């Protein structure tokens, strides 16, 4: 009864305090926004719901106010609470572990219910005392599981936990819950194959248990490595790693961002260690040097002779023959008498100078008398040495050394050997001027090689006897060709712009992989290093003393071929030596081809009734077919050569590009330029091949490419008649004979070719509306036309289909920039045919009725012209520069005086 009375008294006191103070209950919680069924209040008087306060103090073990962060040692749970200072907390029910006071038993019951572990599927069962018991019950009875990661990291009440089946649990871990879009699953560490609560926990794990590059991390990269071995590889590849000495076992500190930092580290940390390692590799050996008398024995006077004058004068002649140890001891004693020796050395020098003056006076008297016995006597007597003769001790069997001198006068001639026999009266006297040298003979200088001709050797200028040249003068051997030995018939250096070059344009963008590169200059120049015989009598005479012909020389033609090589004019030495790669069978073939006489018959035009499909280039065999070519003599067309027995190809076959010739015999390319047939037989001595101007010389033997097959991608290309002479399908009714036009030559690049080509490409892209698929199709058609896979008419039609009416805007520039003269004529003919078909027949005037091959560029509506010399289609602005290029090629026709000078 007393206890009940005390409880009633506490309740009455609390109600009285609540009535006197304003109410703290009602409303919603500032944290969870839930109803304030029961309020938790601390000394800061900030009310929160009892759930949030219990979660903070019991589950999270945090005892501060969730509103103001003030540390709350005690809190009171109740439904209607006054100010905390007015509450008699010592009279309330108390939870000692968490310092929670309860206003009544109902609030305490709510608090205990929050912390109970009840099964959500079995409400009739009593609560479990531990969460592990509830988890075991759920797994056994209901086959439900809770997420271990959520259980470990999420501090929530038991009734708030989620239970999953096995399938749902796997989806929850990888993807998240369908009803909770804020959770996207638990991220996986690919190194450990373990999942973490969220990305923050995964990042903590990677930073704590794995490795990352601190250089890349400062730059914003998020790259991690499973162990340090992979990080070391990253340091070695992307940064600078020091692996010397102790740094090979260090981590992180031996990697550097820049090479300068690495060098500074090596200088500061490893320079001493490298010096120590080098010192450890040294082996200490005790040895001593013998006296150095070699320079004095050779008759050379140096500074050490004057330094050791007094030492030798004191030691005497006998002391110089002593042992090595005695000499070392005397040398040691000499060091301690430096001042005295200096004075004695000065006296010795003065004495030697006086003796030298006396010798010069005596020598002048002997020369005035001119008596030979006097000279011999003076030579036999020799100069009187004030110190006596100085000779180093010789071993047994050693011959007498050269004469020595201790003065600083001229060196005697005996110190230098002469290759020729010495004159009987030329004994050298020290200090005297050298006597007149005897006349040198050819026998005194035998040649070093028997095969070297006397005409090629360089005679040395006679000089004083005994004086040697500081360097050897190389004699011109029979294998050393000089440029002046071979005056050039044609300039060996091609003028820029005259030879066809590999052009970078829109035409070869799609077929660049199928081109064949010309031989590099390094391969051409290797021919100049091969030995050949020199022309003239010296070559024959030198051949007698040389080795006999080898088998290779006999296969190459023997002396006759070598003589041909030596007598023909060449443009350079490398082109002469490049002829060694020609086999005898090829030479015979060339002679046979060169002996053919040009005919006078004109080539018959192909039948005018050929179907349009004949313009398609079929796959032809790899063997070359020769077409009728006009003979050009002194620049005038006399008529084509008779057609050979090769099968005649259908008209319209495209011709291979001039920039990429196949390796063919040299007669196919005459020296005077232009597509000429084989000429008249050359004069004697000129039967060898004459290289084309601007054509690289053939490679040396062993480097000749096979001539049986054309380059890849050109197997279907055969030479064809000029397209201007082939009637098109639109002119099958014409009866006029076509006039003969000059054959197209190599394409000459116009001015600003690259800029104009880029502008053309951009224009085509704009007309195609930057459609890459259509632009790729255009490039594909262009490449097929350049390779001869489609005809000009087909290519023209495909371009019109792609560009429509805009094709006429770019066709003029497209035609001018096409780097192939033959293809230009084909495309121009196709354009003319199209224009003729578009015009009605009734509107044509009679004077303009011409065949398609006679149509001009003005009639076709083009702003261009055709060069009458090379048949290249030009813009009007390029005509002057193009004619200048033709004028620069006038050296293709050398003067007859130059040829006569070379022959004689």
Curated annotation (Swiss-Prot):
Biased composition (Polar residues): 404-416, 521-531, 564-584
Modified residues (Phosphoserine): 437
Pathway this chain belongs to: Protein modification; protein ubiquitination
Keyword Transferase: yes
TM ranges: none
Main location as per UniProt: cytoplasm
Described purpose of this protein according to its UniProt entry: E3 ubiquitin-protein ligase that plays a key role in the ribosome quality control (RQC), a pathway that takes place when a ribosome has stalled during translation, leading to degradation of nascent peptide chains. ZNF598 is activated when ribosomes are stalled within an mRNA following translation of prematurely polyadenylated mRNAs. Acts as a ribosome collision sensor: specifically recognizes and binds collided di-ribosome, which arises when a trailing ribosome encounters a slower leading ribosome, leading to terminally arrest translation.
Name recorded for this polypeptide: E3 ubiquitin-protein ligase ZNF598
